[in-house]
Amino acid sequence: MDLILLQKVTNLGNLGDKVSVKPGYGRNFLVPQGKAVPATAANVEAFETKRAEYEAKASSILADAQSRATKFEGASVTICAHASTEGKLYGSVGPRDIAEAFTAAGLPLEKSEVILGEGAFRNVGEYDVVLHLHADVETTVKVIVESDA
């Protein structure tokens, strides 16, 4: 399935690129999310007439992500969870918990923006977490997991 990208998509391409993807990925994800349109002659022509508008929108989204990244620089959050005396958590701290903690601290964050390379945290400690705010913008924050007992 050939598509024209309306914004930058990680590991796929940039704005205006004509890409070929599997039909399910295009039909079920890229097109409904407004990230791409089918590469028909009419859509190619319509895209070229609105290219400046799409580029302006993409640059404003990037600027918003960069301003959000500056707010997160040096930020840290403490999450209290039930833990054993050895420091092992009863359960885990995952992306949803981290996003909720930052949102409660006044820094809005979606769980899909939290990248945990090694999975959820299962021990008490201090962790560096990568936030993927945009295809071009990533920042690192500190998450401290403490025992609530």
UniProtKB/Swiss-Prot annotation:
Superkingdom of the organism of origin: Bacteria
Coiled coil: none
GO cellular component, one term: ribosome
Keyword Translocase: no
One BP annotation, GO: translation
One family name in Pfam for this protein: Ribosomal_L9_C
Keywords from the UniProt entry: Ribonucleoprotein, Ribosomal protein, RNA-binding, rRNA-binding
SS bond list: none
SUPFAM superfamilies from the UniProt entry: L9 N-domain-like, Ribosomal protein L9 C-domain
GO molecular function per UniProt: rRNA binding; structural constituent of ribosome
Known function: Binds to the 23S rRNA.
Homology family: Belongs to the bacterial ribosomal protein bL9 family.
Protein name: Large ribosomal subunit protein bL9
Source species taxonomy: Bacteria, Pseudomonadati, Pseudomonadota, Gammaproteobacteria, Lysobacterales
